[in-house]
Amino acid sequence: MALTEQKRVRLEKLSDENGIISALAFDQRGALKRLMVKHQTEEPTVAQMEELKVLVADELTKYASSMLLDPEYGLPATKALDEKAGLLLAYEKTGYDTTSTKRLPDCLDVWSAKRIKEEGADAVKFLLYYDVDSSDELNQEKQAYIERIGSECVAEDIPFFLEILAYDEKIADAGSVEYAKVKPHKVIGAMKVFSDPRFNIDVLKVEVPVNIKYVEGFAEGEVVYTREEAAAFFKAQDEATNLPYIYLSAGVSAKLFQDTLVFAHESGANFNGVLCGRATWAGSVEAYIKDGEAAARECVRTTGFENIDELNKVLQRTATSWKERV
């Protein structure tokens, strides 16, 4: 992958001195609202969502290499970032049409790569739901959509992070044993597709290739993969792309995510960092709603800091520099 000078400078801003991306994700919108309504009866307000993002940015970006936010509720938080932290902004609308299995991509209406760059972002992030076994017609539509965003990012000379969430059109429950059995094929297959230079993607943000809760030694119930099988899937995922790639935390606990990274490294996965969200800050939501901003800050300073500090220690032992892949 040939990086322009501007893209390289921006990727360096997003990573630490070792070329590892230890990014904090708080671009959640729908997921954040769902977390909030567990603790309050009224609809979450814009002010509440903005304030939560600001306090997390303010308290934790001094320990992260960068932060991912959304332009809908996250712009005030972009002003609270530590001066050394890079900024990614999400370009996609939250969620997808649940009346269809297509999960078509959709950009935020009043945003563009140009506007994201003007807001001070060092990268554009876009989330795509992709089923490698969907019809060619549907997947060509999705691929063309990603080509457009890639071309925008080339025009603006800004890095393009594509987040791929694999799924199966015929399996509704992504946490099921049924989906766990096909997940490696879905995740690795999608990575292969979007590693093609035609998409102009600079970094892939991906799921781990297995549901770790069904791996021997991690599983509390049914085992779908032996440790050897799971390790082989991590290795196959690494070999599926020549692009830098980082793992998303997918809402699992901080400890399970850290253990997963160690397992990935031991399996031969040369991943280049993480974009970790709920595993770091989820506890602050309840504190914020029940006891206010000061309580939420205290939660972030203690539990949130511990989570990010432990994660950083694990990353230094397990992740590799993105510069080795470009």
From Swiss-Prot:
**Broadest EC class?**
lyase
UniProt cross-references to SUPFAM superfamilies, sorted A to Z: Aldolase (SSF51569)
Q: In which pathway does it act?
A: Carbohydrate metabolism; D-tagatose 6-phosphate degradation; D-glyceraldehyde 3-phosphate and glycerone phosphate from D-tagatose 6-phosphate: step 2/2
- Which Pfam families does this entry report, sorted A to Z? DeoC
Q: What is its EC number?
A: 4.1.2.40
Q: Which GO terms describe its biological process?
A: 6-sulfoquinovose(1-) catabolic process; D-tagatose 6-phosphate catabolic process; lactose catabolic process via tagatose-6-phosphate
Alphabetized UniProt keyword annotations? Lactose metabolism, Lyase
Give GO MF terms, alphabetically. 6-deoxy-6-sulfofructose-1-phosphate aldolase activity; tagatose-6-phosphate kinase activity; tagatose-bisphosphate aldolase activity
Reactions the enzyme catalyzes:
D-tagatofuranose 1,6-bisphosphate = D-glyceraldehyde 3-phosphate + dihydroxyacetone phosphate
InterPro entries documented for this protein: Aldolase_TIM (IPR013785), DeoC/FbaB/LacD_aldolase (IPR002915), LacD_aldolase (IPR050552), Tag_1.6-dipho_adolase (IPR005927)
Report the HAMAP family cross-referenced here. Answer: LacD (MF_00734)
Q: What family, per the record?
A: Belongs to the aldolase LacD family.
Protein name per Swiss-Prot or TrEMBL: Tagatose 1,6-diphosphate aldolase
